[in-house]
């Protein structure tokens, strides 16, 4: 999960440095992480479930997923409650001290993973062969990979900002909203491709725990480490429209959790997740074209999400009752 989040790290830190030097809002950095987390939950798990139903262990609901929910809520509180900038505007921000707390959070999370791994060290995977590699060769690969990620991240940030500027100028649209749209969609989907490939391959091999674990770990890493590092470098200010995107991220987290409670995301569930993303994408386009949040569009989107969550919950309870009978 940490490895597949490297593109998000490169893009968000790159945008943070760009804002530090040139000024402006970090719409790409914040949009990248929020959008990537939404993509992981709705697109990655959605496509994985369409290929092969995802069976979810009970331990995921009791341990890993509650951590993801807690981290997501903390991120929302930091951004929306404590993140108003000093200029008295409606701009939200992740401040430097908040970033440091998030970094401490990822350290604690890694320590928890190490402790959990030692606790379960008696459980091993059979039939797996690990290809040996010399230390020198490993170092070379790490250096080349790091250089590639950094260079790629800078290129993505530069390209995203230019795309946003070009679209905004040509169509006379709000620059911040266009930049947010690019960050939440094009950049987010692009940086989520490693998670998508990893999860689909794992699902096709029947390794469902890897598919879901990859998404959970990646989303936790995105918030605690990527946002933590990026905001520690430079506070991440972002337009006030981010509250809607964060709410969608929280709703997506809850929706997947409802599936997890009943231990399975089947093909129909996969289509529900993918449909949820399409609804969000339509809203983003409406918001960008109109230049502001539209009340009716917000109401329709949140109403549809509520219906989906209720449907999944009722459907899960019905299937659970049938199994008992």
Where are the predicted features?
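Hydrophobic alpha-helical segments, chiefly the membrane-spanning helices
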Residues: 1-325
């Amino acid at each position: 999960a940490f490895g597949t989040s490297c593109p998000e790290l490169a893009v968000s830190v790159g945008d943070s440095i760009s804002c530090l030097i040139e000024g402006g809002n970090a719409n790409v950095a914040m949009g990248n992480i929020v959008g990537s987390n939404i993509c992981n939950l709705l697109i990655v798990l959605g496509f994985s479930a369409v290929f092969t139903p995802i069976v979810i262990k009970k331990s995921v609901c009791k341990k890993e997923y509650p951590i993801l929910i807690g981290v997501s809520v903390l991120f929302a509180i930091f951004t929306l409650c404590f993140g108003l900038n000093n200029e008295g505007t409606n701009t939200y921000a992740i401040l430097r001290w908040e970033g440091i707390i998030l970094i401490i959070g990822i350290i604690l999370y890694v320590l928890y993973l190490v402790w959990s791994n030692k606790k379960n060290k008696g459980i091993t995977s059979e039939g797996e062969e690990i290809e040996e590699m010399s230390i020198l060769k490993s170092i070379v690969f790490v250096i080349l990979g790091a250089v590639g990620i950094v260079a790629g991240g800078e290129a993505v940030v530069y390209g995203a900002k230019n795309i946003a500027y070009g679209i905004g100028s040509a169509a006379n649209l709000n620059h911040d909203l266009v930049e947010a749209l690019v960050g939440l969609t094009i950049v987010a989907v692009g940086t989520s491709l490693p998670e998508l490939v990893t999860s689909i391959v794992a699902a096709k091999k029947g390794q469902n725990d890897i598919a879901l674990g990859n998404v959970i770990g990646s989303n936790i890493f995105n918030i605690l480490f990527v946002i933590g590092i990026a905001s520690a470098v430079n506070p991440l200010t972002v337009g006030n429209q981010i509250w809607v995107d964060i709410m969608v991220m929280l709703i997506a987290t809850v929706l997947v959790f409802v599936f997890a409670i009943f231990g399975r995301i089947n093909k129909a569930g996969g289509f529900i997740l993918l449909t949820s993303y399409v609804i969000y994408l339509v809203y983003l386009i409406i918001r960008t074209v109109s230049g502001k949040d539209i009340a009716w569009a917000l109401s329709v989107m949140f109403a549809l999400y509520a219906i989906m969550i209720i449907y999944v919950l009722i459907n899960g309870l019905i299937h659970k009752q049938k199994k008992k009978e």
